[in-house]
Amino acid sequence: MAAASPLRDCQAWKDARLPLSTTSNEACKLFDATLTQYVKWTNDKSLGGIEGCLSKLKAADPTFVMGHAMATGLVLIGTGSSVKLDKELDLAVKTMVEISRTQPLTRREQLHVSAVETFANGNFPKACELWEQILQDHPTDMLALKFSHDAYFYLGYQEQMRDSVARIYPFWTPDIPLSSYVKGIYSFGLMETNFYDQAEKLAKEALSINPTDAWSVHTVAHIHEMKAEIKDGLEFMQHSETFWKDSDMLACHNYWHWALYLIEKGEYEAALTIYDTHILPSLQANDAMLDVVDSCSMLYRLQMEGVSVGQRWQDVLPVARKHSRDHILLFNDAHFLMASLGAHDPQTTQELLTTLRDASESPGENCQHLLARDVGLPLCQALVEAEDGNPDRVLELLLPIRYRIVQLGGSNAQRDVFNQLLIHAALNCTSSVHKNVARSLLMERDALKPNSPLTERLIRKAATVHLMQ
């Protein structure tokens, strides 16, 4: 286990060639403490957690611009609040910009402010360009690296997510604080672009330095998922659980991966036990978007497998309802819709669809609203049609956009819920036009992910209704 580095003061940041415009050593150390917790996906109680650190940071130097950029950026990157609906967040962005204009900042700091402001306006690609400008000159700027990594993920820019880290990876020598975590960040981009061996090697290197690196655990979980290595995946999660279960911002998602292996095996009760024991409690405690998405995705997958999830949708509905008008990420919207449909709440369903349609009609520079008309709305309508028992309509909506769904972001494993939706619709369709779609989709799935028990079950189902001939 790597020893924790001391928190960096003004001079230490200067020595790292990342000077911060503040004279407060306390503010500099709290900036480092917050950044460290963000990278580790863990609220460290000994540091006071992210919220505690940000509160103390603001008190230490109320006009510390990078403190504002990080605090506001973290709220935005969480995708649970929009400047359109959250006046406090809107004010925070404006305050950050105003303070930045009153000080002689470095170019790096000015770019950070511009990137956060641009992200707040929904122009994620432009924000990434600004973070990349920082990384060209300052390859060890972890905040720029992490913010861009997360934004690329939301955009479905898989190659950029990988290459962004490849460009700066050689500069992260072992003496730099948090350097081992860069291995994990790089490994995830490699994994999402199907470089599984390279990704696993890097993730395992990171874990040999820090076994508690929950993001590297997460990369390995993905690799086993994508290769249908169910036994290996389950063993890995069981053996490593004690190391990652306290990473409170990612543990729920790692448990979700564990549950996916169980769903793949057809062990539905065991999967529901993980949901009830770990995933739902995390959602109710944190209200984090990742936990909402995990909950909705898991219940929806189980339902497609014919499993009764009882009243569980009712537990998720209040959070989905609260965010149904946000329209920050189309990926989130699709999952909120699963909850409102699953809980049979037509009012929330209608509100989500109507306000999303409105957003798509005047998108401005918002990348998600620009994508809503051609991809987001057809996907959402397909979920509605599936619920209403119109499988042929689901195919008509999804087949033309299936290769564009990656643009909604999320991981390959997360977006697989939409592949499964398409296959189930094809299995249930009645139109002769669509009679060979299920066979085609299943052959494609089997070629990409051989030895998948879930695919084998679907092929058997197709055979019983004579769709594999």
From Swiss-Prot:
A GO cellular component entry from the record: extracellular exosome
The protein depicted here goes by the name: Tetratricopeptide repeat protein 38
**First and last residues of every TPR repeat:** 108-141, 180-213, 252-285
- Signal sequence interval, chain numbering: none
Query: Which SUPFAM superfamilies does the protein's record reference?
Result: TPR-like
Ranges annotated as spanning the membrane: none
List N-acetylalanine occurrences by residue. 2
Q: Out of the domains of life, which is the source?
A: Eukaryota
Q: Which residues carry this modification: Phosphoserine?
A: 5
- Keywords for this protein: Acetylation, Phosphoprotein, Repeat, TPR repeat
What organism is recorded for this protein?
A: Homo sapiens (Human)
Q: Report which residue ranges the record marks as coiled coil.
A: none
As for family, the record states:
Belongs to the TTC38 family.
